[in-house]
Amino acid sequence: MKNERKIVLPIYKIVYAVSFAVILSLVRGVTHTYEVGLTIEPPFAILAVVFCADTYVQEIMSRRSEIHRLYPVRKRTVSILERLLIQDIFLLLLAGVCYGLFFLFQTPKTHPVTESEWMQFGVYVGAITVTVFFWSVLANTLSMIFRSMWMGIGGCFLLWLASNSQSGEKLFGAWNVFSYTFREVENAADLRWLCGKALCLFVGILLLLLLPKQVQRI
């Protein structure tokens, strides 16, 4: 695990991820506290894509893939899973810090008809966990299929554009991968947005279950 951490968390990735979170909390203005989580989710999806797209293909770019292929499929699969886990944990910790930075740099007000601050944060943590998981797994999967980090990022970006828009909201409804962002914040009892997160979780787990077969192909 320590060796995998050194591979997937080099200094430059940590620096640009932290810089991204700081800049986001400075430039994206919010008025009410409920807007903080909604503001963070879509940009962090893109960060997860860029951050995790090279989870395996860096082996190809660094010419380590020939050595990597000598290992059993199970060991190679576990290696990729460990890398994804390490990156996701880092991104989730950063997402929590980013949430706090909005309160540090700005002074959002509590909306009178929304949940309590702790409830809002709890919902945000659950939603952003699924978001980071889904986009990181998808980015790695597409990169492995096309054997190109840029193709993986490009494919994810197309889905991001299609779903993170008013058209996407109307088309996908509660099944939108960004259902948390588009949910009715003034109606806490409306939990239909969980359908979108359940879909993300299902697809992400399915892609992980198919990972050994994908490893065999490369």
Which functions belong to the PLM regions below?
Residues 1-14:
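Aromatic- and glycine-rich beta-strand/loop motifs that create alpha-glucan
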Residues 14, 65, 76, 150-151:
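Secondary-structure boundary/capping residues
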Residues 30-32, 115, 150-218:
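Terminal transmembrane helical anchor/hairpin motif
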Residues 53-89:
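Helix-loop-helix units of permease transmembrane domains in multi-pass membrane transporters
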Residues 57-61, 108-109, 147, 170, ...:
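Juxtamembrane transmembrane-helix termini
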Residues 63-74, 95-101, 135-143, 173-185, ...:
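Juxtamembrane/interfacial segments around transmembrane helices
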